Amino acid sequence: MAEDVSSAAPSPRGCADGRDADPTEEQMAETERNDEEQFECQELLECQVQVGAPEEEEEEEEDAGLVAEAEAVAAGWMLDFLCLSLCRAFRDGRSEDFRRTRNSAEAIIHGLSSLTACQLRTIYICQFLTRIAAGKTLDAQFENDERITPLESALMIWGSIEKEHDKLHEEIQNLIKIQAIAVCMENGNFKEAEEVFERIFGDPNSHMPFKSKLLMIISQKDTFHSFFQHFSYNHMMEKIKSYVNYVLSEKSSTFLMKAAAKVVESKRTRTITSQDKPSGNDVEMETEANLDTRKSVSDKQSAVTESSEGTVSLLRSHKNLFLSKLQHGTQQQDLNKKERRVGTPQSTKKKKESRRATESRIPVSKSQPVTPEKHRARKRQAWLWEEDKNLRSGVRKYGEGNWSKILLHYKFNNRTSVMLKDRWRTMKKLKLISSDSED
């Protein structure tokens, strides 16, 4: 091959002499060495490219793995924070905040691929409160079995939240069982009440102290039995709120809350004038807060690392049992639009209140908070003589404290159960409850 190349091209020396010269053996050997060196250099370059590519891919894979782990840690922090916010909204009765926080928690949960035991318990708490908030909406569906009512579903989850069955746990469990039947009877669904009773107390070996009592009440179709007055829905809610307060004290030390609290404290300790640069100050304050909480981050990451061995795969049921079937709107009991909707905190309100709350939000300016506007509108509504009359009649018939039943069976001007309670207290102070002659 070298010989063919040499013979085909004129040598430099031949050109200089004005004639072609035959290549010597030394020149031929040198040409072969040059060709070999060039070939080896090309091979070496190709090898370097091939060797360098896997290293870059490995680095990219390591970076991607680090990002994924960091996202999982951050998602865990957000889940704790949203559970904390959900508990506060539930306890304070802020239904709109409850709904928004619930939807945010749903998005976080659907993005998780695995769970620690602590995160799983957090999800159970969110699921439990969501079902309790929809407790009186019998057509709300949380289970694959459409017959299961919201309170039945809450009862099943409640058993998974707390391993130690203390007195509060037992009280809440019994109250949910009773109200799961009472809610059906209040809606006139006595057949469904029997079915709920069978599902809850179907075990023939179970010996519940109030099992026979409930069976007798169902058979008599006594919706307003004194037993239901003693173990009322409001009593159940108060007990659940006691548990929520426990969760709040437990989760108030979560990382995001601690970091946010440090930022707020840092801002409060500074005197910021309108001439200061807000962006620079904010960055500086947040940087200081981050420095203060660096140890908290390290501790949190250590906790995540230690608990990584105890992670469990996020089963489909953990996602679906939360909110996947709760996407049909927020106004379940609208008088003009009776539509099927699943699980919002407003489901325990009556139709009139739900419609009024929706309409009252429309004209509110964006610069004004919605909640104070609602309260101001409600305070301006004077109580009519007819409303006082209906309130006295309702208390006389159903008893003091059963405001939801009174609201359901008597006509009021866009009132809530809380309004009835406050008005009744005012009437007692003014000694207006004895004026029954007009009734």
UniProtKB/Swiss-Prot annotation:
Region Disordered, annotated ranges: 1-36, 266-311, 326-375
Residue spans of biased composition, Acidic residues class: 23-36
One Pfam family from the record: TRF
UniProt domain HTH myb-type: residue ranges: 375-432
Subcellular compartments: Nucleus; Cytoplasm, Cytoskeleton, Spindle; Chromosome, Telomere
Motif range (Nuclear localization signal): 337-356
Location of the DNA-binding region in this protein: 403-428
GO cellular component, one term: cytoplasm
Highest rank taxon of the organism: Eukaryota
Gene Ontology terms: biological process: cell division; meiotic telomere clustering; negative regulation of DNA replication; negative regulation of establishment of protein localization to telomere; negative regulation of establishment of protein-containing complex localization to telomere; negative regulation of establishment of RNA localization to telomere; negative regulation of telomere maintenance via semi-conservative replication; negative regulation of telomere maintenance via telomerase
Modified positions (Phosphoserine) in chain numbering: 11, 219
Glycyl lysine isopeptide (Lys-Gly) (interchain with G-Cter in SUMO2) crosslink, residue number(s): 213, 325, 366
Consequence of substituting residue 74 to D: Abolishes dimerization and telomere binding
Subunit comment: Homodimer; can contain both isoforms. Found in a complex with POT1; TINF2 and TNKS1. Interacts with ATM, TINF2, TNKS1, TNKS2, PINX1, NEK2 and MAPRE1. Component of the shelterin complex (telosome) composed of TERF1, TERF2, TINF2, TERF2IP ACD and POT1. Interacts with RLIM (via N-terminus). Interacts with FBXO4. Interaction with TINF2 protects against interaction with FBXO4 and subsequent polyubiquitination and proteasomal degradation. Interacts with GNL3L; this interaction promotes homodimerization. Interacts with TIN2. Interacts with RTEL1.
Domain description: The acidic N-terminal domain binds to the ankyrin repeats of TNKS1 and TNKS2. The C-terminal domain binds microtubules.
UniProt protein name: Telomeric repeat-binding factor 1
Organism whose genome encodes this protein: Homo sapiens
